[in-house]
Amino acid sequence: MRSFSLPLPTLFAGFVAVLVGYASSAAIIWQAAAAAGATPGQIAGWMTALGLAMGISTLALSAWRKVPVLTAWSTPGAALLVSGLQGVTLAEAVGIFIFANALIVICGATGLFARLMQIIPHSLAAAMLAGILLRFGLQAFAGLQEHLLLCGGMLAAWLLCKALWPRFAVVAALVIGALIAAASGDVASAAVPLAFVTPEWVAPQFTPALLLSVGLPFFLVTMASQNAPGFATLQASGYTVPVSALIVVCGGLALLLAPFGVYSICIAAITAAICQSPEAHPDPNQRWLAAMAAGGFYLLAGLFGGSITALMSALPPAWIQMLAGLALLGTIGGSLFQAVHQASERDAAVLTFLVTASGVTLAGIGSAFWGVVLGGVSYGVLSALRRP
């Protein structure tokens, strides 16, 4: 019988992944729910249901494939819902969730999404990932301007440990940053209530006009801006997974739990990269343990869904941004190397990287999708017309 161990850096990678995911977008989820008229108690129930759903799916998929598969809510989808759900009843919002997730299940069951992912060159997938993560690296060091002591101390701790004890570099930055923030009074002192909030069932109402005007764009944004980068992240990190099966599982789980506020469950990209990095574990075959740790922290976050927003507001944003940037540094560097390594694919990869990093949104769809589209077209044209 094999012994089981969870190294501290692996555990911390899972913690940082969940921390970054919640800190960067939990407020958007609250705004989307509030736009549909949800009460504070109902919104807290949404956070509970989402945390439990992400925890269960992350644990199940990672244990099944022995691959660091991290699930997440759709942040681009939530941003769309903030405006799309204005004036919509909660029952109609649930109807939109069910409609969109049913389309996701169909897309996975037919294998259409898997076929699209197979034709994306590896260099373009890596370039897209680098473009997605670039802003997190930039945000980390932008904090030096106003929080020099905090960010500088975290960077110094990371550099020292990176040279001497590489696997503990992010852990050291987290601890030193927390100590500096606490000592300088940057951590809010308000009490964070620890209470379990039971999710509330809301019967769906299907309004055809809303399904087309909000549900269909929500489906497209979720697939193009969340699931596609999520699978590209796995591909860029060297992992092979059954795309269709994962889409069906995630979409099916969200479909079942939509009446409780689970508006989407997707394959994570940015936070997953933390669990897929060398800092999580030097052995790529053991990095699934970091995703398992993240799944456990998701469950804890779900059990105390009503406390998440208060906790996030107590942490200094500069600490979270620097922590995310340092945790993703290795992944950004590796992705850039993979993107430009093949000279014949370099131009298309650079275009993919730049468009993705630009943050441009066209037709309500984010830059990650358009980066791959332009990169793919460029790759096809250059491959067909370039002289040998």
Model-predicted segments: where are they?
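Short glycine/serine- and small hydrophobic-enriched flexible loop segments
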Residues: 34, 82-86, 235, 277, ...
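Membrane-embedded alpha-helical modules
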Residues: 86-192, 293-388
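Residue-level signal for transmembrane alpha-helical positions in Major Facilitator Superfamily
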Residues: 23-24, 149, 225, 267, ...
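Helix-loop-helix junctions within the multi-pass membrane cores of secondary transporters/permeases
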Residues: 2-4, 10-29, 48-129, 241-329
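Helix-loop-helix hairpins and the membrane-proximal interhelical loops
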Residues: 1-44, 171-244
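Short, motif-level signal for alpha-helix interfacial/capping segments enriched in acidic residues
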Residues: 51, 238-240, 341-344
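Hydrophobic alpha-helical interface/terminus motif in multipass membrane transporters
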Residues: 32, 81, 116, 137-141, ...
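Alpha-helical membrane-protein architecture signal
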Residues: 8-11, 153, 212-213, 248-252, ...
